[in-house]
From Swiss-Prot:
Keywords: Cytoplasm, DNA damage, DNA excision, DNA repair, Excision nuclease, SOS response. The UvrABC repair system catalyzes the recognition and processing of DNA lesions. UvrC both incises the 5' and 3' sides of the lesion. The N-terminal half is responsible for the 3' incision and the C-terminal half is responsible for the 5' incision. This is UvrABC system protein C. One of its GO terms (cellular component) is excinuclease repair complex. Interacts with UvrB in an incision complex. Belongs to the UvrC family. It comes from Streptococcus pneumoniae (strain JJA).
Length: 615
C-alpha cells in the first residue's frame, strides 16, 4: 500500500457510494459499490484475502470514490460505470451473446423469419429460443402449417413454396389483412401451447385425405401431428398460468459464483442462461450487479415478472428492472427458484470437479513431475504455507495431494507456538519440525515430495530441518509467485535452481492447484482464528452482552464488519436491548461516536450562547 492510498483511506466517508480502483497506468481495473465506503475500501488493504482478491489488490495504486444518496443509487451508478469502463476484474457479460426469436413481420403480406434483433417495428416476436437449431425446428413446423410469404422480394410468378402448400403466393392471393392477422393469432396461440385446435384440424384433414385415397397427403398430416407431439415433449411445462417470467438462482463456493436464469415463456421452460465468475464483494451485492447488467443486454427482453431468491433486496431489483419482482415464499414459483439455485450449485460443482477429476491428466502430471525433478513419481505430495498479519495469530497449514488429487482427510492446521512477531522463516522451521518430527516418532509414511509455498529462504529452512536435524531424505521444492501473486517459478536441487517448467504443461497446472489450495487453506484458518479473537476481544466488556447474545449477533450478521455497519435498530431486532445495542455501536465505532458527541456539544454551546444573547 503506497502513501497516496494511505492518505486517501483517511478521507473516506461512511456514506454509500461507488469506489474505483486504478492500476499504475491509471486504467480502471475494478468498480465496486458499498453501503459504507470507509469500511469497504479499507477492507481491501487489511487482512488476508484469497488468491483472486490478492491479484486485484496487488495492481491497485490509486482509487477514487463517488458518494451517492442511497444504496440503490450506488448500485445503478456501479452498473453504468462498469458498462462504460469495462474493468477487467468486474463481472462482464458477453456483448455478443444473443438468442434467436421467431418473428412475424409487420407487412401487408407478412413473413415468418428468425432474427436475433428485437426492434419496435410492429412485428410479433416469440422467444427467445435456446439456439438457432431449436428456432429453425419450430419454424420449419410452422412453415408446413401456416402458408406465410417466403420471398423477401416479390417474384413475378408463383414460387416453389406455393406448389407445396407453404406459401399463399401473394401475387395472386386475394386474402385481406384480416386473414393474415387471424393466421398470426393462430401462430401465437400455437406457440403458447394452445395447439389442440390445430391438431384437431390436421386430424380432420388426415381422415379426409385417407377417405379419398390420398395416402401420401394423409401421411404428411400424420407426420405434422407427430412433430407437434415431439415439440410438446421437448418444452417442459413449468407453470400453469402461461406467464412469461425469468427465474434467477445463484450459488457461491471457493470465491466463485454461478448464476442460473430460467427463461419461462408461456409457462414453458425454453432455455437457461448460465454464468460462472469470481466475486469480490458480498455475494448478494455482486448478484444485484449481475442482474443490472443482464437486462442492459438487448437480447434479454424484460418479461412479465422476475423471480429472485429470498436473500436478495427486492427494492434494489425493482430499481434495475421495470417489471413485477417476486420473492416467492411457497408453491410453484418457490419451486422454480429452488430449481434454479440447485442447477447453479450443480454447475459450480461440475466446474471444480472438472479441475480435479481428470485422472489421466493428474497421473500424467505427477509422472512428468517426477521425471523433471529426477525423483520417483511423487504419489504423495505435502505442501505448506504460512499466514499472519504483522505477526498476529500466526498459523501454518499443510495440504496433501495423493495421485494428483487433494486428500482432505490428511490436511492439517498449525497454530505457531514458538515465534514472536512476523518471522516467516522461524514459523516454517517450527511447523516442518513439528510435522516431520511426528512422522519420525510415529513411523508415519513420509511424502514423496514436499512443496513449500515460498522462495529460496523458506525452502532452505525446510531442508535444514529435514536433512540436518531429523536426518530424513525427502525431496523438497519451492513455488515462487510473481508480483501478481500467481504461480511463477519452481525451485529445486542442491543448490536451488529454477526448473525449466512449461506453463502449459499438466505438471505446472498441478503445482498451481497445490499452491492455490494450500494458500486457501492457510488463509481460511487464519481468518477464522483472527475473526474469533477479534470478535471476542472487541465485544468483551460490554455490560449485558453475554456469550449467547454474541453468538446470536454473529449468526445473524455473519461478520464483525456487518455488525459495525448495522444500525442500533437492526441490532435491537436480533434480541439485544437498546441500551446494549448502543453500547455495541459505541465500542465498535469509537470515531463515529466521538464525532457525534462533538457535534452534540457544539450544538449545546451554540444554544447556550443564543440564550445568553437574549434580552
Amino acid at each position: 500500500m503506497n502513501n497516496l492510498i494511505k492518505s486517501k483511506l483517511e478521507l473516506l466517508p461512511t456514506s454509500p457510494g461507488c469506489y474505483i480502483h486504478k492500476d499504475k497506468n491509471g486504467s480502471i481495473i475494478y468498480v465496486g459499490k458499498a453501503k459504507n465506503l470507509r469500511n469497504r475500501v479499507r477492507s481491501y488493504f487489511r487482512g488476508s484475502h484469497d488468491t483472486k482478491t490478492e491479484a486485484l489488490v496487488s495492481e491497485i495504486v490509486d482509487f477514487e470514490f463517488i458518494v451517492t444518496e442511497s444504496n440503490i443509487e450506488a448500485l445503478l451508478l456501479e452498473i453504468n460505470l462498469i458498462k462504460e469502463n469495462k474493468p477487467k476484474y468486474n463481472i462482464m457479460l458477453k456483448d455478443d451473446k444473443s438468442y434467436p426469436f421467431i418473428k412475424i413481420t409487420n407487412e401487408r403480406y407478412p413473413r415468418l423469419i428468425i432474427t436475433r434483433q428485437v426492434k419496435k417495428d410492429g412485428g410479433l416476436y416469440f422467444g427467445p429460443y435456446p439456439d438457432v437449431g431449436a428456432a429453425n425446428e419450430i419454424k420449419r413446423l410452422l412453415d408446413r402449417i401456416f402458408p406465410f410469404r417466403k420471398c423477401t422480394n416479390p417474384p413475378s410468378k408463383v414460387c416453389f413454396y406455393y406448389h407445396i402448400g407453404q406459401c399463399m403466393a401473394h401475387t395472386i392471393c386475394k386474402k385481406d389483412e384480416a386473414y393474415f392477422k387471424s393466421m398470426a393469432q393462430e401462430v401465437s396461440d400455437f406457440l403458447k401451447g394452445q395447439d389442440n385446435k390445430i391438431i384437431d384440424e390436421l386430424k380432420g384433414k388426415m381422415a379426409a385425405a385417407a377417405q379419398t385415397m390420398e395416402f401420401e397427403r394423409a401421411a404428411e398430416y400424420r407426420d405434422l401431428i407427430q412433430a407437434i407431439g415431439t415439440l410438446r415433449t421437448k418444452q417442459r411445462v413449468m407453470a400453469k398460468d402461461l406467464q412469461n417470467r425469468d427465474v434467477f438462482g445463484y450459488y457461491v463456493d471457493k470465491g466463485w459464483m454461478c448464476v442460473q436464469v430460467f427463461f419461462v415463456r408461456q409457462g414453458k421452460l425454453i432455455e437457461r442462461d448460465v454464468n460462472l465468475f469470481p466475486y469480490f464483494n458480498d455475494p448478494d451485492e455482486d448478484f444485484l450487479t449481475y442482474v443490472g447488467q443482464f437486462y442492459q443486454e438487448k437480447s434479454h427482453l424484460v418479461p412479465n415478472e422476475v423471480l429472485i431468491p429470498q436473500d436478495i433486496d427486492e427494492e434494489a431489483v425493482k430499481a434495475l428492472v421495470d417489471t413485477k419482482i417476486l420473492k416467492p415464499q411457497r408453491g410453484e414459483k418457490k419451486q422454480l427458484v429452488n430449481l434454479a439455485i440447485k442447477n447453479a450449485r450443480v454447475s459450480l460443482e461440475q466446474k471444480f470437479n472438472l479441475l480435479e477429476k481428470s485422472v489421466e491428466k493428474t497421473q500424467g502430471a505427477i509422472e512428468n513431475l517426477g521425471r523433471l525433478l529426477q525423483i520417483p513419481t511423487p504419489v504423495r505430495i505435502e505442501s505448506f504455507d504460512n499466514s499472519n498479519i504483522m505477526g498476529t495469530s500466526p498459523v501454518s497449514a499443510m495440504v496433501v495431494f495423493v495421485n494428483g488429487r487433494p486428500s482432505k482427510k490428511d490436511y492439517r492446521k498449525y497454530k505457531i507456538k514458538t515465534v514472536v512477531g512476523p518471522d516467516d522463516y522461524a514459523s516454517m522451521r517450527e511447523v516442518i519440525r513439528r510435522r516431520y518430527g511426528r512422522v519420525q516418532r510415529e513411523a508415519l509414511t513420509p511424502p514423496d515430495l514436499i512443496v513449500i509455498d515460498g522462495g529460496q529462504g523458506q525452502v532452505n529452512i525446510a531442508k535444514q530441518v529435514i536433512q540436518e536435524e531429523l536426518g530424513l531424505d525427502i525431496p523438497i521444492a519451492g513455488l515462487q509467485k510473481n508480483d501478481k501473486h500467481q504461480t511463477h517459478e519452481l525451485l529445486f536441487g542442491d543448490p536451488l535452481e529454477v526448473v525449466d517448467l512449461s506453463r502449459n504443461s499438466q505438471e505446472f497446472f498441478l503445482l498451481q492447484r497445490i499452491q492455490d489450495e494450500v494458500h486457501r487453506f492457510a488463509i481460511t484458518f487464519h481468518r477464522q482464528l483472527r475473526s474469533k479473537n477479534s470478535f471476542s476481544s472487541q465485544l468483551d466488556g460490554i455490560d449485558g452482552l453475554g456469550p449467547k447474545r454474541k453468538q446470536n449477533l454473529m449468526r445473524h450478521f455473519k461478520s464483525l464488519t456487518k455488525i459495525k455497519e448495522a444500525s442500533v435498530d437492526e441490532i435491537v431486532e436480533v434480541g439485544v436491548p437498546r441500551a446494549v445495542a448502543e453500547a455495541v455501536q459505541t465500542k465498535l465505532n469509537p470515531q463515529e461516536t466521538e464525532i457525534l458527541l462533538q457535534v452534540a456539544e457544539e450544538r449545546v454551546d451554540y444554544q447556550t450562547e443564543g440564550n445568553h444573547n437574549k434580552p
